[in-house]
């Protein structure tokens, strides 16, 4: 009897590690190939005039032109939507293409938007500078000022945009609180969840309207492609898809293939990066030459309780400040042998960047410090190397201080 009852139970949804491999794929594979085919074409042809009319007048689903979509991209979109728990998804040629196209599809002249102040520099620049040309007002608020956020909402506010975790301080937005504020005023919520990935955080489960991902990072995971995505309910994603068809920003089929290949191992990689980042953060926090460490799953992080409540892992980025001067910071960085000096994150190689010298080189010291970008601030994006080797390399650099 117990066996019979167990058969009647609803089937358990496959785990994310399984879905990262199989979601979006037809069981019957093309030419019996186990891997997704790269459909490298600009145009999809019609057999005859009847097939054209079935497509244009009767709405038969098929492909027409690669800027509007293709088979390889469709599989990537289905898999990403499954992992994020979204109804729909559009993939783009980069994360910034996803962000800018999404924003432009949601606003009109005379509208108002709100964005938090520690969002990605290029996202802030787009909202602060370029949207003015379309007569769209942008309010930039300090991250975590929930009271100020509610006061900033106007009748013409279209959406609230933030990252979570943010770059570089890894601040965590209380997604449930954000949704409640937005719901009271009927505005949309957009979260860039690139630093978390759907493995660690799924904002849609908290009622967020749209999630953005730079698939360049953890999802593809090998530092070899650019890709982006927006995910959410179909009614919203369709608006973005329509503008995407006109704006371009189309991802290449070969990049889609590499994204799909990367997705198959992304749960394994992110699990490793979560563990390594936490080990590195704990080691640095005790180091006498380190001033401060920022990592969401450290109890010393200001948003530790929020992070552990809405995330399953802290991610692969550790931000820290060394003691000393800018010259000392340079000595530390130049002594590293394993960690590569460079921007980006989420790949298999460990990367370290110095925001003051790279992202904010064109800011005055006063401007940088107002944003919290100090002379000795570093962002470490751990790869999948051995944690002990990464720590040993950091020790090599810290020995120079």
Which role does the model predict for each range below?
Residues 2-70:
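N-terminal "arm"/small-domain region of PLP-dependent enzymes with the aminotransferase-like
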Residues 290-378, 382:
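Conserved C-terminal alpha-helix-loop-beta "cap" of PLP-dependent enzymes
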Residues 25-27, 40-46, 195-197, 217, ...:
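Glycine-rich beta-alpha junction loops
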Residues 11-12, 17-26, 89-289, 294, ...:
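Conserved PLP-enzyme active-site core in the AAT-like
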Residues 1-8, 128-129, 137, 155-158, ...:
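PLP-dependent enzyme catalytic core of the Aspartate aminotransferase-like
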């Amino acid at each position: 009897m117990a066996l019979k009852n167990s058969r009647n139970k609803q089937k358990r949804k496959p785990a994310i590690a399984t879905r990262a491999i199989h979601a979006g794929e037809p069981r019957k594979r093309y030419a019996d190939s186990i891997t997704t085919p790269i459909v490298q074409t600009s145009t999809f042809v019609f057999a005859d005039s009847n097939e054209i009319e079935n497509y244009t007048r009767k709405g038969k689903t098929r492909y027409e032109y690669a800027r509007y979509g293709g088979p390889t991209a469709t599989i990537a979109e289905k898999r990403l939507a499954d992992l994020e728990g979204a109804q729909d998804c559009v993939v783009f040629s980069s994360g910034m293409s996803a962000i800018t196209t999404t924003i432009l599809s949601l606003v009109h002249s005379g509208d108002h938007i709100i964005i938090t102040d520690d969002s990605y520099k290029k996202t802030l620049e787009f909202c602060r500078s370029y949207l003015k040309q379309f007569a769209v007002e942008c309010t930039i608020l300090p991250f975590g000022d929930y009271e100020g956020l509610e006061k900033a909402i106007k009748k013409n506010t279209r959406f609230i945009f933030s990252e979570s975790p943010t770059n570089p301080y890894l601040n965590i937005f209380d997604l449930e609180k954000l949704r409640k504020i937005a719901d009271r005023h009927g505005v949309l919520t957009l979260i860039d969840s690139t630093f978390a990935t759907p493995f660690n955080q799924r904002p849609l489960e908290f009622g967020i309207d749209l999630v953005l991902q730079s698939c360049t990072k953890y999802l593809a995971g090998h530092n070899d492609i650019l890709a982006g995505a927006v995910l959410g309910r179909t009614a919203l994603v369709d608006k973005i898809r329509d503008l995407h068809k006109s704006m371009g920003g189309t991802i290449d089929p070969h990049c889609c293939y590499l994204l799909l290949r990367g997705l198959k191992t992304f749960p394994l990689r992110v699990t490793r990066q979560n563990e390594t980042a936490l080990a590195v953060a704990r080691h640095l926090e005790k180091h006498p030459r380190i001033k401060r460490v920022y990592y969401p799953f450290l109890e010393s992080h200001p948003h530790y309780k929020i992070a552990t409540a809405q995330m399953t892992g802290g991610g692969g980025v550790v931000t820290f400040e060394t003691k000393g001067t800018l010259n000392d910071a340079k000595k530390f960085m130049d002594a590293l042998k394993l960690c590569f000096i460079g921007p980006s994150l989420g790949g298999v190689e460990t990367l370290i960047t110095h925001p003051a010298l790279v992202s904010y080189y064109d800011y005055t010291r006063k401007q940088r410090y107002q944003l919290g970008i100090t002379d000795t601030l570093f962002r470490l994006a751990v790869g999948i190397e051995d944690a002990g080797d990464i720590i040993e390399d950091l020790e090599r650099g810290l020995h120079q201080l």
